[in-house]
Amino acid sequence: MHEMRKAGLKAAVYDAGTSFGGTWRWNVYPGARVDSPVPIYELAIPEVYKDWHWTTNYPNWEELQAYFDHMDKVLNLSKDCSFETVVTSAEFDMEEGKWNVGTQDGRKAKAKFLIVCAGFAAKRYIPGFPSMDKFKGTIHHSSFWPVEGVPYEGKRVAIIGTGASGVQMIQVSH
């Protein structure tokens, strides 16, 4: 968005999340942090990085969210964004030479260019287990963890998964 504005383009962003940060707005489980050093997560925009100081080379989700909030405060990108908005259709009109975009809440937009930024983490995967419907406990997914946390102390907890989120949760759950 920042580069598009600098190029004189008018743009709009539709994002299913509540604010900037993508996966770092959804993944707020205990122990969630980057597994690559911060330069990979930092924008190469002097206005943003000149007033920002990381507390660690491997920040957690809270610091990343604060960074994205700082970025928005400096660049004022959210004025052209619609958060909590799911795009449900995008069709190219050959005659008009534009994209017709529709959202879940009924909004329509037209655009000469369409950039889809739905990465591998855009859709949660919850495997089906036999008798899962009979389980009487609570089930949480790491990418939809409540920000206020989950009181799991003193309870028997099963963590299913071998990726970064599973490993990070195991480290802080004992």
Where are these regions (language model features)?
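Gly/Ala-rich phosphate-binding loop of Rossmann-like dinucleotide-binding domains
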Residues: M1, R5-K6, I170, H174
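Short beta-strand "acidic-cap" motif of Rossmann-like dinucleotide-binding folds
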Residues: G8-A16, W24
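Feature captures the FAD/FMN-dependent oxidoreductase FAD-binding
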Residues: T55-A121
